[in-house]
Amino acid sequence: MGRPPCCDKAGVKKGPWTPEEDIVLVSYVQEHGPGNWRAVPVSTGLMRCSKSCRLRWTNYLRPGIRRGNFTPHEEGIIVHLQALLGNRWAAIASYLPQRTDNDIKNYWNTHLKKKLRKQQAIGAIFAPPRPSEPTAGHADCRRHDMTRSSKDSHAACPADSTPAADEVVTQLIAQQFAATDGDTSSSSSYSYASSTDNISKLLNGFMMKSASPARDDATDTIKTSSAIDIDPFDHKSGGAALPPPKKRQQQQHLSSIENWLFDDATEQLVVQLMEEISGGSCSVPMLLY
Protein backbone atom coordinates (compact mmCIF):
# COMPACT_ATOMS: atom_id res chain seq x y z
CA MET A 1 0.00 0.00 0.00
CA GLY A 2 1.00 3.61 -0.55
CA ARG A 3 1.82 6.31 1.91
CA PRO A 4 -1.21 7.36 4.01
CA PRO A 5 -2.27 11.02 3.68
CA CYS A 6 -1.23 13.36 6.40
CA CYS A 7 -4.81 14.49 6.91
CA ASP A 8 -5.72 11.05 8.20
CA LYS A 9 -3.55 11.47 11.27
CA ALA A 10 -5.16 11.89 14.63
CA GLY A 11 -5.82 15.45 15.71
CA VAL A 12 -5.70 16.92 12.16
CA LYS A 13 -8.61 19.12 11.21
CA LYS A 14 -10.42 18.77 7.86
CA GLY A 15 -12.96 20.87 6.08
CA PRO A 16 -13.19 24.56 5.23
CA TRP A 17 -10.90 27.12 6.79
CA THR A 18 -12.16 29.66 9.23
CA PRO A 19 -11.29 33.39 9.07
CA GLU A 20 -9.17 33.09 12.24
CA GLU A 21 -7.10 30.32 10.63
CA ASP A 22 -6.62 32.44 7.55
CA ILE A 23 -5.34 35.38 9.61
CA VAL A 24 -2.84 33.15 11.45
CA LEU A 25 -1.56 31.67 8.18
CA VAL A 26 -1.20 35.05 6.46
CA SER A 27 0.67 36.50 9.45
CA TYR A 28 3.12 33.61 9.48
CA VAL A 29 3.80 33.73 5.73
CA GLN A 30 4.34 37.50 5.81
CA GLU A 31 6.84 37.09 8.61
CA HIS A 32 8.71 33.99 7.40
CA GLY A 33 7.79 33.80 3.73
CA PRO A 34 6.30 30.90 1.81
CA GLY A 35 8.54 27.86 1.71
CA ASN A 36 8.87 25.66 4.79
CA TRP A 37 5.28 24.39 4.95
CA ARG A 38 6.10 21.54 7.31
CA ALA A 39 6.97 24.02 10.06
CA VAL A 40 3.72 26.03 9.69
CA PRO A 41 1.44 23.77 11.78
CA VAL A 42 4.03 23.44 14.55
CA SER A 43 4.97 27.15 14.63
CA THR A 44 1.45 28.57 14.38
CA GLY A 45 -0.43 25.94 16.36
CA LEU A 46 -2.88 25.36 13.53
CA MET A 47 -4.56 21.95 13.51
CA ARG A 48 -3.94 21.64 9.73
CA CYS A 49 -1.50 19.60 7.75
CA SER A 50 1.32 21.22 5.77
CA LYS A 51 -0.34 20.45 2.41
CA SER A 52 -3.58 22.09 3.42
CA CYS A 53 -1.67 25.21 4.53
CA ARG A 54 0.20 25.40 1.22
CA LEU A 55 -2.92 25.01 -0.92
CA ARG A 56 -4.81 27.53 1.16
CA TRP A 57 -2.12 30.12 0.68
CA THR A 58 -1.50 29.39 -2.99
CA ASN A 59 -5.11 29.24 -4.12
CA TYR A 60 -6.79 31.79 -1.84
CA LEU A 61 -4.65 33.88 0.46
CA ARG A 62 -1.62 34.97 -1.56
CA PRO A 63 -1.75 38.52 -2.97
CA GLY A 64 -2.42 39.18 -6.73
CA ILE A 65 -4.92 36.40 -7.23
CA ARG A 66 -7.50 37.37 -9.83
CA ARG A 67 -11.05 36.21 -9.47
CA GLY A 68 -13.87 36.30 -11.96
CA ASN A 69 -14.28 35.40 -15.62
CA PHE A 70 -11.35 34.48 -17.82
CA THR A 71 -10.46 36.80 -20.69
CA PRO A 72 -10.26 35.52 -24.32
CA HIS A 73 -6.47 35.86 -24.14
CA GLU A 74 -6.32 33.67 -21.03
CA GLU A 75 -8.67 31.17 -22.63
CA GLY A 76 -6.42 30.94 -25.68
CA ILE A 77 -3.35 30.34 -23.50
CA ILE A 78 -5.13 27.64 -21.51
CA VAL A 79 -6.32 25.85 -24.67
CA HIS A 80 -2.86 25.99 -26.25
CA LEU A 81 -1.03 24.81 -23.12
CA GLN A 82 -3.55 22.06 -22.46
CA ALA A 83 -2.96 20.74 -25.99
CA LEU A 84 0.80 20.75 -25.32
CA LEU A 85 1.04 19.73 -21.64
CA GLY A 86 -2.17 17.89 -21.06
CA ASN A 87 -3.84 18.06 -17.61
CA ARG A 88 -0.76 19.41 -15.81
CA TRP A 89 -2.64 22.31 -14.22
CA ALA A 90 0.17 23.47 -11.95
CA ALA A 91 2.49 23.84 -14.97
CA ILE A 92 -0.24 25.67 -16.86
CA ALA A 93 -0.87 27.96 -13.88
CA SER A 94 2.81 28.97 -13.87
CA TYR A 95 2.18 30.80 -17.16
CA LEU A 96 -0.80 32.65 -15.61
CA PRO A 97 0.46 34.03 -12.27
CA GLN A 98 -2.84 35.67 -11.43
CA ARG A 99 -4.75 32.42 -11.80
CA THR A 100 -4.56 29.36 -9.61
CA ASP A 101 -4.23 25.83 -10.91
CA ASN A 102 -7.48 24.90 -9.20
CA ASP A 103 -9.37 27.73 -10.94
CA ILE A 104 -7.84 26.83 -14.31
CA LYS A 105 -8.80 23.16 -13.89
CA ASN A 106 -12.35 23.98 -12.86
CA TYR A 107 -12.79 26.49 -15.70
CA TRP A 108 -11.49 23.97 -18.25
CA ASN A 109 -13.80 21.18 -17.12
CA THR A 110 -16.90 23.35 -16.84
CA HIS A 111 -16.58 25.78 -19.77
CA LEU A 112 -13.61 25.51 -22.11
CA LYS A 113 -13.88 21.83 -22.98
CA LYS A 114 -17.54 22.11 -23.97
CA LYS A 115 -16.95 25.37 -25.85
CA LEU A 116 -14.05 23.90 -27.80
CA ARG A 117 -16.01 20.80 -28.81
CA LYS A 118 -18.91 22.97 -29.97
CA GLN A 119 -16.64 25.13 -32.12
CA GLN A 120 -15.02 22.07 -33.67
CA ALA A 121 -18.42 20.62 -34.53
CA ILE A 122 -19.58 23.89 -36.13
CA GLY A 123 -16.34 24.21 -38.08
CA ALA A 124 -16.69 20.65 -39.36
CA ILE A 125 -20.24 21.39 -40.54
CA PHE A 126 -19.54 24.68 -42.32
CA ALA A 127 -16.02 23.91 -43.54
CA PRO A 128 -15.70 23.57 -47.34
CA PRO A 129 -15.16 19.99 -48.53
CA ARG A 130 -11.61 19.03 -49.31
CA PRO A 131 -10.87 18.16 -52.92
CA SER A 132 -10.66 14.42 -53.24
CA GLU A 133 -7.34 13.14 -54.52
CA PRO A 134 -7.61 11.22 -57.80
CA THR A 135 -7.18 7.51 -57.39
CA ALA A 136 -5.05 5.34 -59.61
CA GLY A 137 -8.07 4.32 -61.70
CA HIS A 138 -9.10 7.94 -62.28
CA ALA A 139 -5.53 8.86 -63.22
CA ASP A 140 -5.35 6.00 -65.73
CA CYS A 141 -8.70 7.00 -67.26
CA ARG A 142 -7.58 10.61 -67.56
CA ARG A 143 -4.29 9.56 -69.16
CA HIS A 144 -6.19 7.32 -71.60
CA ASP A 145 -8.51 10.19 -72.52
CA MET A 146 -5.58 12.53 -73.12
CA THR A 147 -3.86 9.92 -75.33
CA ARG A 148 -7.06 9.35 -77.28
CA SER A 149 -7.63 13.07 -77.79
CA SER A 150 -4.05 13.49 -79.04
CA LYS A 151 -4.56 10.63 -81.51
CA ASP A 152 -7.80 12.19 -82.71
CA SER A 153 -6.09 15.53 -83.21
CA HIS A 154 -3.33 13.86 -85.27
CA ALA A 155 -5.95 12.04 -87.33
CA ALA A 156 -7.85 15.27 -87.91
CA CYS A 157 -4.78 17.02 -89.33
CA PRO A 158 -4.78 17.45 -93.14
CA ALA A 159 -2.90 14.82 -95.10
CA ASP A 160 -0.88 17.39 -97.05
CA SER A 161 1.00 18.40 -93.91
CA THR A 162 3.05 15.16 -93.89
CA PRO A 163 6.27 14.76 -95.91
CA ALA A 164 4.85 11.78 -97.85
CA ALA A 165 1.82 13.81 -98.86
CA ASP A 166 4.11 16.65 -99.94
CA GLU A 167 6.01 14.25 -102.18
CA VAL A 168 2.76 12.96 -103.70
CA VAL A 169 1.57 16.50 -104.38
CA THR A 170 4.95 17.36 -105.91
CA GLN A 171 4.76 14.34 -108.20
CA LEU A 172 1.22 15.23 -109.26
CA ILE A 173 2.29 18.79 -110.05
CA ALA A 174 5.28 17.49 -112.03
CA GLN A 175 3.01 15.16 -114.00
CA GLN A 176 0.62 18.01 -114.68
CA PHE A 177 3.44 20.22 -115.94
CA ALA A 178 4.72 17.33 -118.07
CA ALA A 179 1.26 16.87 -119.57
CA THR A 180 1.06 20.61 -120.20
CA ASP A 181 4.46 20.57 -121.91
CA GLY A 182 3.35 17.59 -124.04
CA ASP A 183 0.21 19.41 -125.07
CA THR A 184 2.24 22.50 -125.89
CA SER A 185 4.68 20.50 -128.01
CA SER A 186 1.84 18.70 -129.76
CA SER A 187 0.05 21.97 -130.40
CA SER A 188 3.25 23.42 -131.76
CA SER A 189 3.68 20.31 -133.92
CA TYR A 190 0.25 20.48 -135.45
CA SER A 191 0.39 24.28 -135.63
CA TYR A 192 3.32 23.75 -137.99
CA ALA A 193 0.70 23.46 -140.77
CA SER A 194 0.65 27.22 -140.79
CA SER A 195 4.30 27.20 -141.86
CA THR A 196 3.42 24.64 -144.52
CA ASP A 197 0.62 26.99 -145.53
CA ASN A 198 3.17 29.72 -145.90
CA ILE A 199 5.30 27.42 -148.03
CA SER A 200 2.27 26.63 -150.19
CA LYS A 201 1.61 30.35 -150.54
CA LEU A 202 5.25 30.82 -151.46
CA LEU A 203 5.01 28.08 -154.03
CA ASN A 204 1.73 29.53 -155.26
CA GLY A 205 3.65 32.57 -156.47
CA PHE A 206 5.72 30.35 -158.73
CA MET A 207 2.63 28.50 -159.86
CA MET A 208 0.68 31.54 -161.09
CA LYS A 209 1.60 30.66 -164.69
CA SER A 210 0.69 27.00 -164.34
CA ALA A 211 -2.60 25.46 -165.39
CA SER A 212 -5.82 25.63 -163.40
CA PRO A 213 -5.74 21.95 -162.33
CA ALA A 214 -2.51 22.51 -160.49
CA ARG A 215 -4.03 25.60 -158.85
CA ASP A 216 -7.05 23.60 -157.75
CA ASP A 217 -4.82 20.89 -156.27
CA ALA A 218 -2.79 23.48 -154.38
CA THR A 219 -6.02 25.01 -153.10
CA ASP A 220 -7.16 21.59 -151.88
CA THR A 221 -3.83 21.15 -150.12
CA ILE A 222 -4.21 24.52 -148.43
CA LYS A 223 -7.78 23.68 -147.38
CA THR A 224 -6.61 20.36 -145.99
CA SER A 225 -3.84 22.02 -143.94
CA SER A 226 -6.18 24.77 -142.75
CA ALA A 227 -8.76 22.15 -141.81
CA ILE A 228 -6.11 20.48 -139.69
CA ASP A 229 -5.55 23.81 -137.95
CA ILE A 230 -9.24 24.55 -137.37
CA ASP A 231 -10.29 21.12 -136.09
CA PRO A 232 -8.45 21.31 -132.75
CA PHE A 233 -10.42 24.46 -131.78
CA ASP A 234 -13.85 24.26 -130.25
CA HIS A 235 -16.03 27.10 -131.56
CA LYS A 236 -18.67 26.59 -128.89
CA SER A 237 -16.32 26.87 -125.93
CA GLY A 238 -14.19 29.55 -127.56
CA GLY A 239 -10.97 27.92 -126.29
CA ALA A 240 -8.44 25.42 -127.50
CA ALA A 241 -9.49 21.82 -126.82
CA LEU A 242 -7.19 18.82 -127.02
CA PRO A 243 -7.76 16.71 -130.20
CA PRO A 244 -8.79 13.08 -129.78
CA PRO A 245 -6.07 10.41 -129.76
CA LYS A 246 -6.67 9.32 -133.37
CA LYS A 247 -6.50 12.87 -134.70
CA ARG A 248 -3.41 13.50 -132.61
CA GLN A 249 -1.67 10.48 -134.13
CA GLN A 250 -2.67 11.64 -137.60
CA GLN A 251 -1.39 15.12 -136.89
CA GLN A 252 1.90 13.75 -135.57
CA HIS A 253 2.16 11.61 -138.71
CA LEU A 254 1.43 14.61 -140.93
CA SER A 255 3.90 16.75 -139.00
CA SER A 256 6.64 14.15 -139.55
CA ILE A 257 5.84 14.11 -143.29
CA GLU A 258 5.84 17.89 -143.37
CA ASN A 259 9.18 18.02 -141.57
CA TRP A 260 10.59 15.60 -144.05
CA LEU A 261 9.21 17.59 -146.95
CA PHE A 262 10.39 20.87 -145.50
CA ASP A 263 13.84 19.78 -144.33
CA ASP A 264 14.98 17.31 -146.99
CA ALA A 265 13.23 18.04 -150.29
CA THR A 266 12.22 21.67 -150.27
CA GLU A 267 14.97 22.78 -152.58
CA GLN A 268 14.52 19.76 -154.85
CA LEU A 269 10.79 20.37 -155.17
CA VAL A 270 11.34 24.02 -156.00
CA VAL A 271 13.78 23.07 -158.75
CA GLN A 272 11.43 20.46 -160.19
CA LEU A 273 8.52 22.87 -160.12
CA MET A 274 10.54 25.52 -161.92
CA GLU A 275 11.57 23.03 -164.57
CA GLU A 276 8.04 21.75 -165.05
CA ILE A 277 6.61 25.27 -165.25
CA SER A 278 9.17 26.20 -167.81
CA GLY A 279 8.45 22.95 -169.76
CA GLY A 280 4.64 23.47 -169.79
CA SER A 281 3.79 20.54 -167.55
CA CYS A 282 2.79 20.61 -163.87
CA SER A 283 3.23 17.89 -161.31
CA VAL A 284 2.10 19.80 -158.23
CA PRO A 285 -0.03 16.88 -157.03
CA MET A 286 3.24 15.17 -156.05
CA LEU A 287 3.17 17.26 -152.89
CA LEU A 288 0.26 15.21 -151.65
CA TYR A 289 2.22 11.99 -151.55
From Swiss-Prot:
GO terms for molecular function: DNA-binding transcription factor activity; sequence-specific DNA binding; transcription cis-regulatory region binding. Residues 9-61, 62-116 form the HTH myb-type domain. Residues 139-154 have a biased composition (Basic and acidic residues). SUPFAM superfamilies: Homeodomain-like (SSF46689). The keyword Kinase does not apply. The keyword Transcription regulation applies. SMART domains: SANT. GO terms for biological process: positive regulation of DNA-templated transcription; regulation of lignin biosynthetic process; response to auxin. Disruption phenotype: No visible growth defect but increased cell walls thickness and higher lignin content. Residues 37-61, 89-112 bind DNA. Mainly expressed in highly lignified tissues such as vascular tissues. This is MYB transcription factor 69. It comes from Zea mays (Maize).
